[in-house]
Swiss-Prot record:
The modification N5-methylglutamine is found at Q153. GO terms for molecular function: rRNA binding; structural constituent of ribosome. It comes from Psychrobacter arcticus (strain DSM 17307 / VKM B-2377 / 273-4). Residues 135-162 are annotated as: Disordered. PROSITE patterns: RIBOSOMAL_L3. Gene3D superfamilies: 3.30.160.810, Translation factors. Methylated by PrmB. Belongs to the universal ribosomal protein uL3 family. This is Large ribosomal subunit protein uL3. One of the primary rRNA binding proteins, it binds directly near the 3'-end of the 23S rRNA, where it nucleates assembly of the 50S subunit. InterPro entries: Ribosomal_uL3 (IPR000597), Ribosomal_uL3_bac/org-type (IPR019927), Ribosomal_uL3_CS (IPR019926), Transl_B-barrel_sf (IPR009000).
Length: 212
């Protein structure tokens, strides 16, 4: 395992290569990831680094969270994230320290995790890419319906996991194998090739690619 960074999706734009090719990119803002806890095998049963980022109003922080942040000596953030780590990842990482955008470098491959945009309750045509039924020729009301969902008296039920209408989006999604086009450590910006999950302003987790 390798540690990563928590950032905020700023939106998409494009950059041009020296040859004039246009590359679609996503800009991720990386505020300093403050280390709130370093877990080890003896105490916690596994090795990990816990971080927070951003700020949160004092009235929005629970008493337990206040104590946790105070013990680490860091300002309260908008959440807490954890990265599994090995011995080399933990070297030089101490509670209260910071992890910055320069953790990554240009040309590195990364995996990005975020929450996909919520679409609400959607039908099977939009949600599962089902084909529509006939527009006319005796079909009424069922143009975008999914049709039969079961068999007969045996099994006499609808199987779990059947593709039907329901909540779409707002799921944890990971896109793998994206290239880091550039890193601006001073401004705390990562420019990543392609699209990443979630809406503008949403939190995303950037890790070194597991398949690189």
């Amino acid at each position: 395992m390798a540690i990563g960074l928590v950032g905020k999706k700023c939106g998409m734009t494009r950059v041009f290569t020296e040859a004039g090719a246009s590359i679609p990119v996503t800009v991720v803002e990386i505020s300093a990831n403050r280390i709130t806890q370093v877990k080890n095998t003896d105490v916690d049963g596994y090795q990990a680094i816990q971080v927070t980022t951003g700020t949160r109003r004092d009235s929005r922080v629970t008493a337990a969270q206040k104590g946790h942040f105070a013990k680490a000596g860091v300002a309260a953030g908008r959440g807490v994230w954890e990265f599994r780590a090995n011995d080399s990842d933990l070297e030089g990482r101490e509670i209260g320290g910071e992890i910055l955008a320069d953790l990554f470098e240009q040309g590195q491959m990364v995996d990005v995790t975020g929450s996909s945009k919520g679409k609400g309750f959607q039908g099977p045509v939009k949600r599962h890419n089902f084909s529509m039924q006939d527009a006319t020729h005796g079909n009424s009301v069922s143009h975008r319906a999914h049709g039969s969902t079961g068999q007969n008296q045996s099994p006499g039920k609808v199987f779990k996991g059947k593709k039907m209408a329901g909540q779409m989006g707002n799921k944890r999604v990971t896109v793998q194998g994206l290239e880091v086009i550039s890193v601006d450590a001073e401004k705390g910006l990562l420019v990543i090739k392609g699209a990443i999950p979630g809406a503008t302003g949403g939190d995303v987790i950037v890790r070194p690619s597991v398949k690189a």
